[in-house]
C-alpha cells in the first residue's frame, strides 16, 4: 500500500532529522586521488547517413528544459559500441562528447545551456556498431525562458511490496547535478515506515512526515522546534495521513483515513487502495489544537486530500459518497470541493462549494495541487477511487482558477499511470510520477506550463548513466 511522494525544495534540508534521532556520526578521512588518463577520441569517418532519429533513453527528443537542470545524459539503444554527440546552441556555443553513452561535462553543460536560455540546443548523434558509424537525424532540446530556481527535489524511494516495510527512506536530490542524500531512512527507525512528507511551499523550515508502526507518530517541525503528534486520538477516526501546509506556516491540514487494500483477480490490475471512511481537519501549529468542522466530517461522505489555496483563504479537498467495499469499489468517485478558511480566526466558512464535478462525467479526481501564484490547480483524473498509482488510465489535468475550465495535460501525459505531482515555487515547472517506462515502477518526470496553460513534453529526471540507473534500481519514487 504505497503512494508516490515528491516535493520541490528551495534549499538543502538541515540536519535536524539526524540530530533528532541521535544518529551516530563518523568522521571520514577522504583521500583524493587524481588520475590523469589519456583517452583517444575517435574520428567519425565515412558515417552512413540515416533518415531516422536516434533511439535514445531517456526520450529527450524535443523536450523543453530549464537552464539550471543537470546534464541531460542519454544512452543510444541497441547494440552500440560507442556514441559521438555534438551539441550546438542556437545562441552560440558547442560541446562534444564521445564514449559508451552521452556523458556531458557538468561545467561545460551548464555554460552552454545558460547561454542559450530561451533558445534551443541541436544534437548531432553518431553511433558505432560492428566497426561502422551511423549518423542520425539531428534532434533538438528547447531551453525554457522560465527559471526553475528550486534547489532540488525531495521524494520517498521504496522497494516493491504490499505488507512488509522493506528498506525505504526520504531523500533529497539536487536538480543542477546528480547528488542525492538521505534525509531519513527507516533503518534509523527499525521496522517502521516513513511517508507523506510535506514542506510549507518548498521551504524545509516547516516540515511534516509520518512514522508508521507500533510506536508511530506524526513529526511536525516549525520555527526550529519539533513536535510528535499521536498517530491516532479520540477526536479523529483514523490515522493522520495526507498533509498540506497553510502558506503562512501557522496551520497544517490533514486527512484522517481508515485505509485498506484489496487485490484484483483480473488482468493488468493489481491492487486497489481505498478508505472505509475519511475526514478532513486542520491543525493549529502554534496553539497545538485541532480545528474540526462537521462539514468536513460527515457521516455518509468521505472527505480526503485537503490543500490550501495560494492565499490561504480556501481549503480544497475531495469528497465522495462512501460506498460499500469490496462490492462497490468502482462506484467510489470523488468531486473536488472547497470551503472558506479564515486564517486570522482559524475557522471554516459555513458552506461547501463543488469546484469540479468529476462524478457527473463518470470520473473521479485526486491529488489537488494549487499553483503558488494562485492561477491554476492541478489534479489527477481517473475512472474511480483516489489512489491513482495503480490506475493505468490516470492522467494529469489543469484547472484554470480564473475561467474555471479544466483540460488534460496531453503533452505531459502517457498511456500509463501519470499520478502524484507538485509545483515548483515559480508555478511554471512541475514534477510528477509516471509508470510509462514499464508499467510497474513510478519514476519522476518534469514539465513546464506556459502562459496559456499548455504543458511541454515531459522529461525523465536526469541521471549520470540513465540506462544503468533506471534498469538496475528496484525502487519506486
At which residue positions do the language-model features occur?
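Sequence signature of WD/YWTD-type beta-propeller architectures
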Residues: 40-477
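Bacterial Sec-dependent N-terminal signal peptides
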Residues: 1-46
Amino acid at each position: 500500500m504505497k503512494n508516490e511522494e515528491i516535493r520541490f525544495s528551495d534549499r538543502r534540508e538541515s540536519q535536524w532529522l539526524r540530530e533528532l534521532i541521535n544518529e551516530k556520526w563518523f568522521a571520514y578521512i577522504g583521500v583524493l586521488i587524481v588520475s590523469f588518463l589519456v583517452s583517444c577520441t575517435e574520428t567519425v569517418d565515412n558515417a552512413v547517413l540515416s533518415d531516422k532519429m536516434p533511439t535514445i533513453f531517456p526520450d529527450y527528443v524535443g523536450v523543453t528544459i530549464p537552464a539550471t537542470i543537470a546534464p541531460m545524459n542519454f544512452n543510444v539503444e541497441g547494440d552500440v559500441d560507442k556514441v559521438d554527440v555534438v551539441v550546438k546552441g542556437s545562441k552560440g556555443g558547442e560541446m562534444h562528447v564521445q564514449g559508451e553513452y552521452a556523458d556531458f561535462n557538468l561545467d561545460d553543460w551548464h555554460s552552454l545551456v545558460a547561454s542559450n536560455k530561451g533558445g534551443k540546443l541541436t544534437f548531432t548523434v553518431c553511433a558505432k556498431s560492428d566497426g561502422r558509424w551511423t549518423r542520425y537525424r539531428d534532434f533538438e532540446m528547447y531551453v525554457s525562458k522560465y527559471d526553475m530556481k528550486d534547489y532540488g527535489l525531495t521524494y520517498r524511494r521504496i522497494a516493491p511490496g504490499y505488507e512488509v516495510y522493506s528498506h525505504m527512506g526520504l531523500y533529497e536530490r539536487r536538480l543542477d547535478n546528480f547528488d542525492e542524500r538521505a534525509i531519513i531512512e527507516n533503518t534509523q527507525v527499525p521496522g517502521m515506515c516513513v511517508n507523506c512528507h510535506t514542506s510549507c511551499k518548498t521551504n524545509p523550515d516547516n516540515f511534516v512526515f509520518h512514522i508508521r508502526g507500533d510506536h508511530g507518530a506524526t513529526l511536525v517541525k516549525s520555527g526550529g522546534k519539533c513536535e510528535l503528534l499521536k498517530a491516532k486520538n479520540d477526536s479523529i477516526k483514523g490515522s493522520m495521513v495526507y498533509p498540506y501546509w497553510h502558506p503562512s506556516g501557522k496551520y497544517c491540514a490533514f486527512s484522517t483515513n481508515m485505509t485498506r487494500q484489496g487485490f484484483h483477480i483480473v488482468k493488468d490490475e493489481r491492487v486497489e487502495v481505498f478508505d472505509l471512511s475519511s475526514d478532513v481537519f486542520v491543525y493549529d501549529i502554534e496553539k497545538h489544537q485541532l480545528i474540526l468542522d462537521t462539514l468536513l466530517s460527515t457521516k455518509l461522505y468521505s472527505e480526503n486530500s485537503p490543500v490550501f489555496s495560494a492565499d490561504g483563504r480556501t481549503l480544497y479537498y475531495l469528497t465522495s459518497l462512501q460506498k460499500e467495499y469490496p462490492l462497490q469499489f468502482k462506484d467510489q468517485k470523488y468531486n473536488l470541493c472547497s470551503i472558506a478558511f479564515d486564517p486570522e480566526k482559524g475557522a471554516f466558512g459555513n458552506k461547501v462549494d463543488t469546484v469540479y464535478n468529476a462524478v457527473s462525467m463518470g470520473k473521479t479526481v485526486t491529488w489537488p495541487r494549487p499553483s503558488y501564484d494562485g492561477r491554476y490547480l492541478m489534479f489527477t483524473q481517473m475512472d474511480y477511487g483516489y489512489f491513482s498509482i495503480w490506475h493505468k488510465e490516470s492522467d494529469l489535468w489543469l484547472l484554470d482558477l480564473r475561467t474555471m475550465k479544466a483540460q488534460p495535460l496531453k503533452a505531459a501525459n502517457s498511456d500509463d499511470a501519470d499520478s502524484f505531482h507538485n509545483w515548483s515555487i515559480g508555478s511554471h515547472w512541475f514534477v510528477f510520477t509516471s509508470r510509462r517506462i514499464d508499467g510497474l515502477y513510478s519514476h519522476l518526470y518534469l514539465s513546464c506550463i506556459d502562459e496559456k496553460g499548455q504543458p511541454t513534453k515531459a522529461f525523465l529526471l536526469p541521471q549520470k548513466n540513465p540506462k544503468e540507473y533506471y534498469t538496475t534500481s528496484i525502487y519506486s519514487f
